[in-house]
């Protein structure tokens, strides 16, 4: 035993040669995270820009989606690696912050990670890289703000140009001349003059109806429901001078709160039960009719039918139009539009809680029907957009594209500055940051230079997706910007470099600043991860 213990004891306990941490494992995990995130970025890169490709997504339940919206593609993608999931969340963050630039933000993040990978390989510490990226990002925002052109809400043309730029990269780009002005008018109609910088897109309701083409899309000054009027008992389908109630209770016999059974011993008792039910329903309808109400919007009930056949019969006799199964999440929009209050109990049914409209009618549209409420008195600041499409795929993509256009206009309302598109701001950023990197000392300069080079991925990808020579295009862009042409960008339609502002290719400043800020934050977070711990 002593012979065995002797060599063990002779080993130094705190050998300087031994490493305290397993650096190899940390590097492997960091590079695995970077490679996974870059794979996600490469998957959506081909869909960037007006000439970008579309993706066909087939879901597990057999649904097929055709889109080139970055947020939609990534949202439907099954990503398992945790770092790659961060890029999916990054796209969602950009979607909620700006509504557009969801592909751009992921592509920039992928390019930054590629540059960081080479910096790490050269032995630069992740913390140094992270701090330098933060500094470069701040400088980039300052440069973009200096390049921006102020815009006023009265300048409708600038708003339309910006919305058109967003729509030009979509599947429905040929309809941008229709959808862009429609998006601008919809947003401007819901702006509160007292708080002009706040736009709530929940005040704009998009209703999809299959049939026709996207050309038939239009705004409705009032309310539109993709529902039919209940006509089981021959009730009215058109009401003028409507007094509308939005109710959240059922017009049906009451039920007990506890589980119990009632034993009926003879037919007279049965007859009495039916008579009581009839009297109860008649009493409710008399109260409703007494207020002058002639249109009922009934909230959908998950427990039972919101309205029974007997109730429909009596409502039809009272000449009251019934629209049932209104979704719970629509109630707030409906009451705001009609300038009325939702009624939760028959005892609270009052005339002052009703909304007033000139006309409520059921209209035929294609092979289906919709309900329109127009001429609303004291209408709230809301608007409805009726989107049409020849098939479900086009209809869904038209809705997504219109949502992006609405978000772009919202961005301009909240931060009223425009910048050029077509890769012009990214090349200008790359040039100015590259010059700034030369005056920085130490490793910071290398990191900022890498940040500047990463931004060139946007013009490079735009040119590549348009079938142009990306190296020649980016080189020519650099020369133009070096000569002071800060608005020189890629005109993918002409296949050459032009003054992109003159071509009306513009985007909100908020979209670009948000993309660069969020991409930088995400990359810094990925760089700081040196281990993945799985827990049960």
Curated annotation (Swiss-Prot):
GO molecular function, one term: ATP hydrolysis activity
Gene3D superfamilies in the record: GroEL, GroEL-like equatorial domain, TCP-1-like chaperonin intermediate domain
Keyword Membrane tagged: no
Statement: the UniProt record of this protein carries the keyword Nucleus: no
Top-rank taxon: Eukaryota
Keyword set, alphabetical order: ATP-binding, Chaperone, Cytoplasm, Nucleotide-binding
Compartment(s) where it occurs, according to its Swiss-Prot or TrEMBL record: Cytoplasm
UniProt xrefs under Pfam families: Cpn60_TCP1
Chain spans, region Disordered: 1-21
GO cellular component: cytosol
Family: Belongs to the TCP-1 chaperonin family.
Entry function: Molecular chaperone; assists the folding of proteins upon ATP hydrolysis. Known to play a role, in vitro, in the folding of actin and tubulin.
Cross-referenced PANTHER family: CHAPERONIN
NCBIfam families noted in UniProt: chap_CCT_delta, thermosome_alpha, thermosome_beta
Subunit field text: Heterooligomeric complex of about 850 to 900 kDa that forms two stacked rings, 12 to 16 nm in diameter.
Record protein name field: T-complex protein 1 subunit delta
């Amino acid at each position: 035993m002593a012979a065995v213990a002797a060599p063990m004891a002779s080993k130094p306990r705190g050998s300087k040669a031994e490493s305290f941490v397993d650096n190899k494992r940390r590097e492997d995990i960091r590079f695995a995270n970077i490679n996974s995130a870059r794979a996600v970025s490469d998957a959506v890169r081909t869909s960037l820009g007006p000439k970008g490709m579309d993706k066909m997504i087939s879901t597990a339940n057999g649904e097929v989606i055709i889109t080139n919206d970055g947020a939609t593609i990534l949202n439907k993608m099954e990503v398992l690696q945790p770092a790659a999931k961060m890029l999916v969340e990054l796209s969602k963050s950009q979607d909620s912050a700006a509504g557009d630039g969801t592909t751009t933000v992921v592509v920039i993040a992928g390019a930054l990670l590629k540059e960081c990978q080479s910096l790490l390989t050269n032995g630069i510490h992740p913390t140094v890289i992270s701090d330098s990226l933060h500094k470069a990002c701040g400088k980039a925002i300052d440069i973009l703000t200096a390049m921006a052109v102020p815009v006023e809400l009265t300048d409708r043309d600038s708003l339309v140009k910006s919305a058109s730029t967003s729509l030009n990269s979509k599947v429905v780009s040929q309809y941008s001349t229709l959808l862009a002005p429609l998006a601008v008018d919809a947003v401007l109609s819901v702006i509160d003059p007292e708080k002009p910088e706040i736009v709530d897109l929940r005040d704009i309701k998009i209703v999809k109806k299959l049939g026709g083409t996207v050309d038939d899309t239009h705004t409705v000054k009032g309310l539109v429901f993709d529902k039919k009027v209940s006509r089981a008992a021959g009730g009215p389908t058109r009401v003028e001078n409507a007094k509308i109630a939005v109710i959240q209770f059922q017009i049906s016999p009451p039920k007990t709160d506890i589980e119990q059974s009632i034993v009926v011993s003879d037919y007279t008792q049965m007859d009495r039960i039916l008579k009581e039910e009839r009297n109860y329903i008649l009493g409710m309808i008399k109260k409703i009719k007494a207020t002058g109400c002639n249109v009922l919007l009934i909230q959908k009930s998950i427990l039972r039918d919101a309205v029974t056949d007997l109730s429909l019969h009596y409502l039809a006799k009272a000449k009251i139009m019934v629209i049932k199964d209104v979704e719970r999440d629509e109630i707030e929009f409906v009451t705001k539009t009609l300038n009325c209050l939702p009624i939760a109990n028959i005892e609270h049914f009052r005339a002052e809680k009703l909304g007033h409209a000139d006309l409520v009618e059921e209209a035929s549209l294609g092979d289906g029907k919709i309900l329109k409420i127009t001429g609303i008195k004291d209408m709230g600041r809301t608007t409805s957009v009726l989107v049409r499409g020849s098939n479900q795929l086009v209809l869904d993509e038209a809705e997504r594209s219109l949502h992006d256009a609405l978000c772009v206009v919202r961005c301009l309302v909240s931060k009223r500055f425009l910048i050029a598109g077509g890769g012009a701001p990214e090349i200008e950023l790359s040039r100015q940051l590259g010059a700034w990197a030369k005056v920085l000392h130490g490793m910071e300069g290398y990191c900022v230079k890498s940040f500047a080079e990463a931004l060139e991925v946007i013009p490079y990808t735009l040119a590549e997706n348009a079938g142009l020579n990306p190296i020649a295009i980016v080189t020519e862009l650099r020369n133009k910007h070096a000569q002071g042409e800060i608005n020189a960008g890629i005109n993918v339609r002409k296949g050459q470099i032009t003054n992109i502002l003159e071509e009306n290719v513009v985007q909100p400043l908020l979209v670009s600043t948000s993309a660069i800020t969020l991409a930088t934050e995400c990359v810094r977070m990925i760089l700081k991860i040196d281990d993945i711990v799985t827990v049960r």
